[in-house]
């Protein structure tokens, strides 16, 4: 059997970080993922997919991602159910993220033209920010792509993105 999900989208709200009674970090967030086709009005629709990430990755997601951040998620679909306050059974489908990739330079959402030399959400404490945060050190770490500069920095043209282009 195979249960594998790969998503790329933007967060619709800031991640919500909690801790279990045993002290294990868990973060919830929702990704807006564009559908590959347009509806009858010519508009692109989006799916809003709930994601859950655990442990150190959850803390990293809460610290470095926010509403509007572009992220990649690799994981599996999981369903659960519970009885709500009215006694009705509620079914929930969510992606249990095994890996979360930060797909934009840190601070690009709020600082416009920040000069960041590292794609993937890296920081001085975590130079391989775009890699799987759940891997133990000493594992097979991959270098992030070889990007050294913002490809749009010397273009001289403003990037024109309207609110209609955003999936949230």
Curated annotation (Swiss-Prot):
GO molecular function, one term: single-stranded DNA binding
Keyword RNA-binding on entry: no
Compositionally biased intervals (Polar residues): 107-117
Protein keywords: DNA damage, DNA recombination, DNA repair, DNA replication, DNA-binding
Motif, Important for interaction with partner proteins: chain positions: 163-168
GO BP term, example: DNA recombination
Domain (SSB) ranges: 1-104
Region (Disordered), start-end ranges: 103-168
SUPFAM superfamilies with a match to the protein in the record: Nucleic acid-binding proteins
Gene Ontology cellular component list: nucleoid
UniProt signal peptide: none
Entry keyword annotation includes Aminoacyl-tRNA synthetase: no
Function in brief: Plays an important role in DNA replication, recombination and repair. Binds to ssDNA and to an array of partner proteins to recruit them to their sites of action during DNA metabolism.
Oligomer and partners: Homotetramer.
The protein, known as: Single-stranded DNA-binding protein
Organism: Halalkalibacterium halodurans (strain ATCC BAA-125 / DSM 18197 / FERM 7344 / JCM 9153 / C-125) (Bacillus halodurans)
Originating gene: ssb
